[in-house]
């Protein structure tokens, strides 16, 4: 009996362990299938593709996707095709950005002008530094910047590293931008303001433009930025009011953007205020004209117009490739309405250097007056 009992005790654990392992297999397999399904879903067609009936035509094959992207690029109008970035200055600036662990909107947003801006000589090369990391808390449908609800904490060395990089490049005008940081109490305003101040300490002659977020409508943070010592306060409305809910993250509203531009000018009247509008998203001429009037009503000084370019097939589609002649038309209208300056063209972006050269002259003349 004792031997039998011992055998039973020795056998029972093995039996239960075997049963537990077998029972776990379906669970592990199910989790694996769910993970694979989630990955496929993330890489698959967008909701817009289902609405337009094109989801069935899509594939998850990376090679096929690359082929389709190549075919799509062939359809671009000639005026939207640019040469591949290259040159000594381009690679030197790129190395500096890497060495100092900085992010640039030029790369993150896949700007088509990166070769022209980074490839210029020492006096004209321009890079738009993106502060507060490379991950945004918002998900606008036109933007290719990475998104996450809880990005990494801001790098406390970033303001100093940014100022050091800019002093290396010997620029006379620099653009700072930021990802939206709704996870931070101040939206990142003090971090951005500190960067401006560090730059001014190292090189007082440099003119600084900041392309800031809306800080979720917290106008006190707009005051912090406006008083930081910057020269140009830029904040983009991006599109017309009617398309804003479709184009931008739900936390970004048209009226909120107007209030940011208005408050910046009220806080420091000598600031140049600036905004940018993308065309080709389905807007009408009447809507664009009204947007320009709304901007002038809040005393916005500078406006730029550029063609919306779809970063990837997961972003919203281009409704229209606007012809260069139309961009010329909007430039004329902007000047008629009283804007200080307007850069308008298919490849123009909010920090495009052509506009900076003009604004730089205006600001330096104001300093001398």
From Swiss-Prot:
Its cofactor is [4Fe-4S] cluster. InterPro entries: Aldolase_TIM, Elp3/MiaA/NifB-like_rSAM, LIAS_N, Lipoyl_synth, rSAM. It is found in: Mitochondrion. It is an enzyme of class 2 (transferase). Residues 1-32 form a transit peptide. [4Fe-4S] cluster 2 binds at residues 136, 140, 143. One of its GO terms (biological process) is lipoate biosynthetic process. Residues 121-340 form the Radical SAM core domain. Pathway: Protein modification; protein lipoylation via endogenous pathway; protein N(6)-(lipoyl)lysine from octanoyl-[acyl-carrier-protein]: step 2/2. Binds 2 [4Fe-4S] clusters per subunit. One cluster is coordinated with 3 cysteines and an exchangeable S-adenosyl-L-methionine. One of its GO terms (cellular component) is mitochondrion. Gene3D superfamilies: Aldolase class I (3.20.20.70). SUPFAM superfamilies: Radical SAM enzymes (SSF102114). SMART domains: Elp3. Keywords: 4Fe-4S, Iron, Iron-sulfur, Metal-binding, Mitochondrion, S-adenosyl-L-methionine, Transferase, Transit peptide. It catalyses: [[Fe-S] cluster scaffold protein carrying a second [4Fe-4S](2+) cluster] + N(6)-octanoyl-L-lysyl-[protein] + 2 oxidized [2Fe-2S]-[ferredoxin] + 2 S-adenosyl-L-methionine + 4 H(+) = [[Fe-S] cluster scaffold protein] + N(6)-[(R)-dihydrolipoyl]-L-lysyl-[protein] + 4 Fe(3+) + 2 hydrogen sulfide + 2 5'-deoxyadenosine + 2 L-methionine + 2 reduced [2Fe-2S]-[ferredoxin]. [4Fe-4S] cluster 1 binds at residues 106, 111, 117, 351. The keyword Transferase applies. Belongs to the radical SAM superfamily. Lipoyl synthase family. This is Lipoyl synthase, mitochondrial. It comes from Eremothecium gossypii (strain ATCC 10895 / CBS 109.51 / FGSC 9923 / NRRL Y-1056). The lineage of its organism: Eukaryota, Fungi, Dikarya, Ascomycota, Saccharomycotina.
């Amino acid at each position: 009996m004792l031997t039998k009992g011992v055998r039973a005790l020795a056998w029972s654990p093995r039996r239960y362990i075997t049963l537990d392992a077998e029972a776990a297999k379906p669970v592990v397999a199910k989790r694996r299938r769910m993970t694979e399904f989630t990955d496929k879903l993330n890489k698959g067609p967008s909701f817009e593709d289902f609405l337009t009936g094109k989801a069935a035509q899509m594939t998850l094959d990376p090679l096929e996707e690359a082929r389709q992207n190549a075919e799509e690029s062939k359809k671009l109008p000639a005026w939207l095709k640019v040469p591949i970035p290259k040159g000594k200055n381009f690679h030197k600036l790129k190395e500096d950005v890497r060495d100092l662990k900085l992010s640039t909107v030029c790369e993150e947003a896949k700007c088509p002008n990166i070769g022209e801006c980074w490839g210029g000589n020492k006096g004209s090369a321009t890079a738009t530094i993106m502060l507060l990391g490379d991950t945004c808390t918002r998900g606008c449908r036109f933007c290719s910047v990475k998104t996450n609800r809880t990005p990494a904490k801001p790098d406390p060395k970033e303001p100093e590293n940014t100022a050091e990089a800019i002093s290396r490049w010997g620029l006379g005008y620099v653009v700072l931008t930021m990802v939206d940081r709704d996870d931070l109490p101040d939206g990142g305003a003090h971090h951005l303001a500190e960067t401006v101040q560090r730059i001014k300490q190292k090189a007082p002659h440099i003119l600084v433009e900041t392309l800031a977020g809306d800080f979720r409508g917290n106008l006190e943070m707009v005051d912090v930025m406006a008083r930081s010592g910057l020269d140009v306060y830029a904040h983009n409305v991006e599109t017309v009011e009617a398309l804003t809910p479709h184009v931008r993250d739900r936390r970004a509203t048209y009226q909120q953007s107007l209030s940011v531009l208005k408050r910046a000018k009220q806080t420091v009247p000598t600031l140049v205020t600036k905004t940018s509008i993308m065309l080709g998203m389905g807007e009408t001429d009447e809507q664009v004209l009204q947007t320009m009037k709304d901007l002038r009503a809040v005393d916005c000084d500078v406006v730029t117009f550029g063609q919306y370019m779809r970063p990837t097939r997961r972003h919203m589609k281009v409704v229209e490739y606007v012809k260069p002649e139309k961009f010329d038309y909007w430039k004329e209208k902007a000047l008629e309405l009283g804007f200080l300056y307007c850069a308008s063209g298919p490849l123009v972006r909010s920090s495009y250097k052509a506009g900076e050269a003009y604004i730089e002259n205006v600001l330096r003349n104001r300093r001398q007056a």
